[in-house]
Amino acid sequence: MRARQAFFTKQLAWLQDTNWWQMLGYAWLVFIFGRFAMFLLPEALKPLLDKPLLALPLLLIVAKDLVGIPDFSRRMRQVARKGTPWSERLGATLPPEFLAFLKLGRAMRQGFLAWVRRQPHPARPAGAVLTYTERGAYSTVLAFAVFSACIELPIDAAIATIFIDEPRVRAILHVCSLFSAATILMWVAGDRWMVRGAKGHVLTGDALDLSIGARASGIIPLDAIAGCDNLTEKPDLWCKRHGVARRDTVTVSPFDAPNVVLRLRPEAPVTIMTYQMATQAPACVFLYLDRPELLGAAVRRSQEA
């Protein structure tokens, strides 16, 4: 009985820790592998397993939806007051990740327009800049994204010409491919403009000002940091070893694996925005820094003072 309860608790924690975008990705993979399995199964089994294999991705989505009922009820109570705009009521019915994605897209478009207009970057506070792009993979990832977007157009055009005879369908696919490539390039330009303006996180006299463009922001008072440790393993392994739930942590990194973990004091809660979604009072913050020793030294000086 205890083993069964422990298994159920573990699966429930996994559903809670997995965000909606990850769950949709898992459901898509299950669907693809299910369709591939149908080609390999004997003809006698295909009619029996076709519908169950199609239902598996839906079961993942339903399970995630059921786990989110308490959070959904809390959001609906918050917007139940009189005078709440209808747009806010409608937004409360959607998972927070979906609304955050819409906000992120708007921020990327604004960054792209600012880059086109050559607008000045917003001012950052005075202090020591902790960079994260000089030694990391940020430039490499952006270059790969630009290359992928450019190479996608001729490849999609060739595939559509070979396999699709209907001119109207080919034209629709060409437009979709062009829109996809243009969106990728717009996001790359907007993100680069905002990250370049941020320059890095800023360590002021009493706080750590986090900023990775529109993808992460927040202010952590140095007094709220209980400890700063170098991270030499995956965050999931670190959380398991220290008994910290993954959903009680937040990762602030452009694209690299975190190399620093900040342990925060529960009596001094902070709010950190990641991908336009707020995480309130996280227990730990995983960071990537080009020179993590600078942050560690500042935290130690703050604790000694």
Model-derived features: where do they sit?
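Transmembrane alpha-helices and immediately adjacent membrane-cytoplasm interface residues
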Residues: 59-71, 179-196
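Lipid-exposed faces of alpha-helical membrane segments in multi-pass integral membrane proteins
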Residues: 30, 56-63, 143, 147-153, ...
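Conserved beta-hairpin
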Residues: 186-232
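Membrane-anchoring hydrophobic segments
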Residues: 1-76
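Hydrophobic alpha-helical transmembrane segments
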Residues: 44-59, 164-181
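Non-transmembrane, membrane-adjacent beta-strand/coil modules in membrane-associated proteins
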Residues: 213-284
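Polybasic (Lys/Arg-rich)
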Residues: 281-305
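N-terminal membrane-targeting/pre-transmembrane regions
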Residues: 2-18, 67-171, 281
